[in-house]
UniProtKB/Swiss-Prot annotation:
This protein's record includes keyword Cytoplasm: yes
Cellular component per GO, a single term: cytoplasm
EC number: 6.3.5.3, 3.5.1.2
One GO-annotated biological process of the protein: 'de novo' IMP biosynthetic process
Listed pathway(s): Purine metabolism; IMP biosynthesis via de novo pathway; 5-amino-1-(5-phospho-D-ribosyl)imidazole from N(2)-formyl-N(1)-(5-phospho-D-ribosyl)glycinamide: step 1/2
Domain Glutamine amidotransferase type-1, residue spans: 2-225
Organism encoding this protein: Lacticaseibacillus casei (strain BL23) (Lactobacillus casei)
Gene name of the encoded protein: purQ
Taxon lineage: Bacteria, Bacillati, Bacillota, Bacilli, Lactobacillales
Location of this chain's protein in the cell: Cytoplasm
Protein name: Phosphoribosylformylglycinamidine synthase subunit PurQ
Tree of life domain: Bacteria
Length: 228
């Protein structure tokens, strides 16, 4: 698998994400600039956490206009795999890759803590190394992580199996306890928890490693569950 991490001005999880994918999961992973307009060399493109362009206006609202986003739309439309984590999730919703929106947390506070998740769909490119019902603990760090969608969209997400991760104890008010969703075709995932911060036992556990191992399995056809 060859992956790219888009490093926007204000991104602060780009190096962490590259490290998790390259040094822990063992895949190729480049950092690329938001001015890049050709993504055809990659199997997976990752949009990291942080505060892209200072999150002025609102989270992800400026990053969505970066030149790389047009290339990312073409990449996703051609079936390439895209994952947005935290601010990356916000960027993907702003740019229309994913349904719904991320609002201020229910209590209007920035939340930085480990949270419990359950795996709702283990049949995606991002979750095939888990099993339905698996309990995960991943860190969150966000002020605008409260997932909102209208009732019709929420019903479609549930019916289509697009909810991949769900909070066990909802920390931020997200509707249906949603922590991570895919697009309708299943090749784009947005999630607020940070899997890249949970890939080593010494640093908070390895529950997030399965996200990256799933992508390796999807793109290379190699089941790497034994490495977890």
């Amino acid at each position: 698998m060859k992956a790219a991490v888009i490093s926007f001005p204000g991104s602060n999880c780009d190096l962490d994400l590259q490290w998790a994918v390259r040094d822990i999961a063992g895949a190729e992973c480049d950092l690329i600039k938001p001015t890049q307009t050709d993504l055809t060399a990659y199997d997976v493109v990752m949009v990291p956490g942080g505060f892209s362009y200072g999150d002025y206006l609102r989270s992800g609202a400026i990053a969505r206009f970066s030149p790389v986003m047009d290339a990312l739309k073409q990449f996703a439309a051609a079936g390439g795999y895209v994952i947005g984590i935290c601010n990356g999730f916000q960027i993907l919703t702003e740019a229309g890759f994913l349904p719904g929106a991320l609002q201020w947390n229910r209590d209007l506070n920035f939340i930085c803590e480990p949270v419990a998740l359950t795996v709702e769909n283990a049949g995606t490119a991002f979750s095939n190394q888990y099993q339905v019902g698996d309990h995960l603990t991943l860190p969150i760090a966000h002020g605008e992580g409260n997932y909102y969608a209208d009732p019709e969209t929420l019903a479609a997400l549930e019916t289509n199996g697009q909810v991949v991760f769900r909070y066990a104890n909802n920390p931020n008010g997200s509707m249906h306890d949603i922590a991570g969703v895919t697009n309708e075709t299943g090749n784009v995932l947005g999630m607020m928890p940070h899997p890249e911060r949970a890939v080593e036992a010494l640093l908070g556990g390895t529950d997030g490693l399965g996200v990256f191992q799933s992508l390796i399995n999807q793109t290379e056809g190699a089941d790497v569950r034994g490495a977890r």
